[in-house]
Amino acid sequence: MRDPVETYMNLVPMVVEQTNRGERAYDIFSRLLKERIIFLTGPVEDGMSTLVVAQLLFLEAENPKKEISMYINSPGGVVTSGLAIYDTMQFIRPPVSTLCTGQAASMGSLLLCAGAKDMRFSLPNARIMVHQPSGGFQGQATDIMLHAQEILNLKKRLNEIYVKHTGQTYKAIEDALERDKFLTADMARDFGLVDKVIDKRPEEASPAKPV
């Protein structure tokens, strides 16, 4: 049976450009990276996190002042992988705008709200979901206690990040994240996860700038 990832990659369109040195072919994602657009799609895990972090650092090296756009469609995933992306977004000098297409759940919602001020967007039919971290561990009783304390520490840290970027109180965030909380784009805007819901790009805007 063929690897589904290999099958998918074989379907990625190629873009051919004419240059002074002849034709040059890019896969569609590499071509959009030239426009400073990063796609964060699928589960957040170590491999995907490494690629996104590398792209952020590359675009900063190219131009430390020019905006980077991140398009998010993710069900979430591993907390530490997501925090690696989050920390890099805050670390680099270029402002990072975020745009939710499809869904931004769990760590996806945290990365969505972590965009630069007034540069966090959602398409009208996107869905956003926030909740507390989950996990499981087997082993000695003492080790289980240590891991339980660690997940509580992670929960507290994630709550603090949401507080920072949404403007909500810690209590409001804690209550909202107690269970899976599903939000429409408008509800996410009212909650402070995004700044604006957009349904059409202005004619003068470039692909890297949603509004």
From Swiss-Prot:
It catalyses: Hydrolysis of proteins to small peptides in the presence of ATP and magnesium. alpha-casein is the usual test substrate. In the absence of ATP, only oligopeptides shorter than five residues are hydrolyzed (such as succinyl-Leu-Tyr-|-NHMec, and Leu-Tyr-Leu-|-Tyr-Trp, in which cleavage of the -Tyr-|-Leu- and -Tyr-|-Trp bonds also occurs). It is found in: Cytoplasm. It comes from the Bacteria. Its EC number is 3.4.21.92. Disulfide bonds: none annotated. The active site is at S106 (nucleophile), H131. Keywords: Cytoplasm, Hydrolase, Protease, Serine protease. It is an enzyme of class 3 (hydrolase). GO terms for cellular component: cytoplasm; endopeptidase Clp complex. GO terms for biological process: protein quality control for misfolded or incompletely synthesized proteins. InterPro entries: ClpP, ClpP/crotonase-like_dom_sf, ClpP/TepA, ClpP_His_AS. One of its GO terms (molecular function) is ATP-dependent peptidase activity. PANTHER family: ATP-DEPENDENT CLP PROTEASE PROTEOLYTIC SUBUNIT. Cleaves peptides in various proteins in a process that requires ATP hydrolysis. Has a chymotrypsin-like activity. Plays a major role in the degradation of misfolded proteins. Belongs to the peptidase S14 family. HAMAP family: ClpP. Fourteen ClpP subunits assemble into 2 heptameric rings which stack back to back to give a disk-like structure with a central cavity, resembling the structure of eukaryotic proteasomes. This is ATP-dependent Clp protease proteolytic subunit. The lineage of its organism: Bacteria, Pseudomonadati, Pseudomonadota, Alphaproteobacteria, Hyphomicrobiales.
